[in-house]
Amino acid sequence: MDVNEEVKIFRTALYACEIMVKSGSETYRAEDTIKRMLASKGFLNISTFVSPTVIILGDNLKDGNCYIKNIPKRSSNLARIENVNEVSRSYVQGKISTDEAMEKLKIIENESPYPYWLMCLGCGISCAAFAILIGGNYTDFIATLITSILALHLNEIINAASNTVFLGNFIGSLIVSVVAILFSKIGLGSSLESTIVGSVLPLVPGVAFTGGVRDFITGDLISGTARCIEAIMIGIAIAFGVGVCMTVFNALGGL
């Protein structure tokens, strides 16, 4: 096989794995994808190391190459993971070439499955419905609808400008708590607790924590530990943001 073609195959498989890890995929799923794609082209002596922050791919042959990819940011996008799986299956079955697979992967990484406004609206309605579920009324529904969309939007803006997910969650939870209290003061919302809990739901790392537990179950202890600790730290950042807001308002005369 031509050396350039070999490099192209490895980079395509690595790219598929990168998109999956960035989108919150479990480690074992990303490793399985990269191994299947390479095995379909005759590369059977492959070693991989996948974690939430780095991917290492190497050929065990004496003159084999080694590839390393850093993952600076991650999110949760199950639709993107499914789309990569579809490309991987087509590639393994020989339905598409390496170049076609790479082009499809680039499209998957750059496109959004839904318009941003629709994602915000869906998030807001879901969080507002949860506020009703835990004891709120229609005024809490309206307040939570607004504050949860604000939380999602703030988190997206801050995470785009920062390399840490903790800052966005802290500032987001702090600001939406302030807005929720102000809404409560003007009569928009009768249950402040329901409004705040519903408002911070977009920030809660439920998928990340679940992925970490699944990594533990499949024996990927490093990835499982990293994901779970990250999820716990995000939860602490959210709680700290809400706590700071409540403490300050209480110090200023109470709620």
Model regions and ranges:
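Core alpha-helical transmembrane segments of integral membrane proteins
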Residues: 113-186, 190
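C-terminal ends of transmembrane helices
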Residues: 104-107, 151-162, 210-223
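Soluble N-terminal domains of membrane-associated systems
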Residues: 1-96
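Generic detector of multi-pass transmembrane helix bundles and their immediately adjacent loops
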Residues: 185-255
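Alpha-helical transmembrane segments and their cytosolic membrane-interface
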Residues: 73-140, 230-239, 250
